[in-house]
Structure formats: C-alpha cells, structure tokens
Regions:
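N-terminal auxiliary segments of SAM/dcSAM-dependent transferases
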Residues: 1-44
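The AdoMet/dcAdoMet-binding core of the Class I SAM-like
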Residues: 2, 53-187, 194-201, 205
C-alpha cells in the first residue's frame, strides 16, 4: 500500500511525504500527537496535523533558536524555555557549560513522554541535571517571575488553542518583567508566505 501524509497549507498547496508506517497516534488534553516514519526525513512529529520537526532537519530550528541569543548575551546563566517538550532546544542549551539553570515550562506531559520514546536523541537534553521541567501553562508560570532569567525562549507552537496566551500583550509584559536588565527574549515565528498565514503572523505582534 502506498501511504502518504499531507499537511495542508492552503486550498491549493500541501506538503506530502511518503510514509512507511505510523509509529504512534494519541490525543492529549492539549493536542493530537502523531509520530510517522518516512523514507525521506526519518521519523517526524506531527501535532494537530502539522509537522513540528523530523529526524533530518530538527537542527535547523533548534540551533538557530539557541546559538543566536547565547552568542549575544554577555553572561547567560539562567534560561527559561516555554514549550520545548520535545527536548530539542534543551539539548542544544546543554552544550553550554556556563549555563547553571534551564527551566522548561511545557503543559503537555504526554508530548514529553512520546518524544522521550521516539526521539531519544533530542530528549536527552531533558535529563541534564541543570534542566527543570514544569508541567503547567507558560503564561501562568511567568506571572510569578521577576528579574529571574537571562534568556527566555518561546518555543511554543503557532498562536492557536492552548498556546494563544503566549502571544498576548500580557505575555510580553510578563516576559519583560521576568528578564534581567540585560535579558534577551526570542521566539519562533511562522512565515506569512501564504495569504492564509498572514493573520496568524500578525497576531504574534
């Protein structure tokens, strides 16, 4: 049987990948989670029908997300990652011995367990002794932070559903308060290449 997975971008555009088999399918309190094995990219993680990353290309996102703020900040010691349950960002952060504390705030515990099982090379970062995982909402977590972090990385998915709160005025205000005076915040931003994505990108600002 010829199996294909398709991620629909617009009524006229979709990304399709030949799929060898489905390794996992589940539904957490927050989202649908699928792991597929593909000949071209290896295993891919799919959340709510959208590809999050693959074995072949995770470094593109994770390394750019981490290395830029780490190169710019003069003396980073404490980092907060909002989202990041797959462990990819944490894995790159743990390459820096100068970091003393890495806090991961991820509401979806099922996502973390799935990634530990199917993407162990990425999830190894979650086992570093400097890493603390908090299973809670990122916006609520930030409300109790003040002058705590050198770097905040918003590694949440696009601003829909349970992540909407991480792209609001309250979130940015709380992030500013949680950062130290020379702190840096970085967050992922989808591409508005298609007209259908424009409203989502605008909502992040």
């Amino acid at each position: 049987m010829d199996l294909w997975f398709s991620e629909v971008h617009t009524p006229d555009v979709k990304l399709s990948l030949r799929t060898a088999k489905q390794l996992y399918a589940g539904k957490s309190e927050w989202q649908d989670i699928d792991v597929l094995d593909t000949p071209a990219f290896g295993k891919i993680l799919v959340l709510n029908g959208h590809v999050l990353f693959s074995d072949a290309d995770d470094f593109v996102y994770n390394e750019m997300t981490v290395h830029v703020p780490m190169a710019v900040h003069p003396n980073p010691k404490k980092v907060l990652v909002l989202g990041g349950g797959d462990g990819g960002v944490a894995q790159v952060l743990t390459l820096y011995p100068e970091l003393e504390q890495i806090d991961i705030v991820e509401p979806d515990e099922m996502l973390v367990e799935v990634c530990r099982k199917y993407f162990p090379d990425f999830a190894t970062g979650l086992d570093d002794p400097r890493v603390n995982i908090y299973y809670q909402d990122g916006l609520r977590f930030l409300r109790n932070c003040e002058d705590d972090y050198d770097i905040i990385i918003n590694d949440a998915t696009d601003p829909f559903g349970h992540t909407e709160g991480l792209f609001t005025k309250e979130f940015y205000g709380n992030s500013y308060r949680a950062l130290k005076e020379d702190g840096i915040m970085i967050y992922q931003h989808g591409s508005p290449f298609f007209d259908e994505d424009e409203s989502a990108c605008r909502s992040m600002h």
